């Protein structure tokens, strides 16, 4: 009878486990159904970790060659990069949010992000430790190491899932706060614009006489400017004519002065030229007389 009861209990427990475990898998998969790039990157890390947890022969081989830790490192970096980019996009939208609320939400978000990064780092470190432990066994049985690793990985996956869900919630709150602040900002701007438009309408009604006076004054100023411009053009033309008359007079006086100088100096030049010619002639006569040979006596 006890054997039958024991068999019945084991059957019930096995059935409960068979019913519960698929729900856990479905829940784990459903967590990452959002379309944000950082969540898709984390989903790839999650799926790869689930494959590592099988500890199959291929996993064992790649663990010993450090290929698994290298792949996890790349997936971690990709997740953190996408998460940082998404957070930056949200920070651009939180302008209208109150500063104290913004600081509180940002601090909570940073804490959740740090916990997720720490979980991923611990997974990688634990796998590196396992590789070192297996290599130190020098060919001995490593079943106990694999069992401890499998248990540790299950705990790490649960913690990773919990912290990832917490980060999702913090990001959702942060985004909701940003949207609420933006809506308040838009509402305030809309009210301000409405007030300004009403003020502008009232000012337009009251400023109509002022506009007419301003237009009349503008026409008057424009007429005066045109008159001044016309007078300036006339004056400029008059000055140009006077300058032309002065130029003609200067040229006439210059020509007269040149003619007078010519009348003064030409007689003197002619007289000097004549005297010079006479002097040359006398010198030549004198030189010729002094060089002629004396006459011979018979």
From Swiss-Prot:
Name the Pfam families on file: Apolipoprotein (PF01442)
Where do the record's region annotations for Specificity for association with VLDL lie?
A: 260-272
SUPFAM superfamilies documented for this protein: Apolipoprotein A-I
Phosphoserine-modified residues are: 141
Give start and end residues of every sequence repeat.
74-95, 96-117, 118-139, 140-161, 162-183, 223-244
Q: Where is this region: 8 X 22 AA approximate tandem repeats?
A: 74-244
Looking up InterPro entries in the UniProt record yields: ApoA_E, Apolipoprotein_A1/A4/E
| Record's GO cellular component terms | chylomicron; extracellular exosome; high-density lipoprotein particle; low-density lipoprotein particle; multivesicular body, internal vesicle; very-low-density lipoprotein particle
* Residues annotated with Methionine sulfoxide modification: 137
| Record PTM | APOE exists as multiple glycosylated and sialylated glycoforms within cells and in plasma. The extent of glycosylation and sialylation are tissue and context specific. Glycated in plasma VLDL.
GO biological processes: acylglycerol homeostasis; cholesterol efflux; cholesterol metabolic process; lipoprotein metabolic process; melanosome organization; phospholipid efflux
Q: Spell out the subcellular localization from the entry.
A: Secreted; Secreted, Extracellular space; Secreted, Extracellular space, Extracellular matrix; Extracellular vesicle
Q: Which domain of life is it from?
A: Eukaryota
User: What keywords would UniProt list here?
Assistant: Chylomicron, Endosome, Extracellular matrix, Glycoprotein, HDL, Heparin-binding, Lipid transport, Lipid-binding, Oxidation, Phosphoprotein, Repeat, Secreted, Signal, Transport, VLDL
Signal peptide residues are: 1-18
Which stretches of sequence are listed as region LDL and other lipoprotein receptors binding?
152-162
* Binding-site residues for heparin, renumbered to this chain: 156-159, 218-225
Would I find Cell membrane among this entry's keywords?
A: no
Q: Where, if anywhere, are coiled coils annotated?
A: none
Q: Identify the stretch(es) annotated as Lipid-binding and lipoprotein association.
A: 204-272
Name the Gene Ontology molecular function terms of this record: cholesterol transfer activity; heparin binding; phosphatidylcholine-sterol O-acyltransferase activator activity; phospholipid binding
The text of the family note is: Belongs to the apolipoprotein A1/A4/E family.
What is the role of the protein in this entry?
APOE is an apolipoprotein, a protein associating with lipid particles, that mainly functions in lipoprotein-mediated lipid transport between organs via the plasma and interstitial fluids. APOE is a core component of plasma lipoproteins and is involved in their production, conversion and clearance. Apolipoproteins are amphipathic molecules that interact both with lipids of the lipoprotein particle core and the aqueous environment of the plasma.
* Quaternary state and interactors: Homotetramer. May interact with ABCA1; functionally associated with ABCA1 in the biogenesis of HDLs. May interact with APP/A4 amyloid-beta peptide; the interaction is extremely stable in vitro but its physiological significance is unclear. May interact with MAPT. May interact with MAP2. In the cerebrospinal fluid, interacts with secreted SORL1. Interacts with PMEL; this allows the loading of PMEL luminal fragment on ILVs to induce fibril nucleation.
Q: What is this protein called?
A: Apolipoprotein E
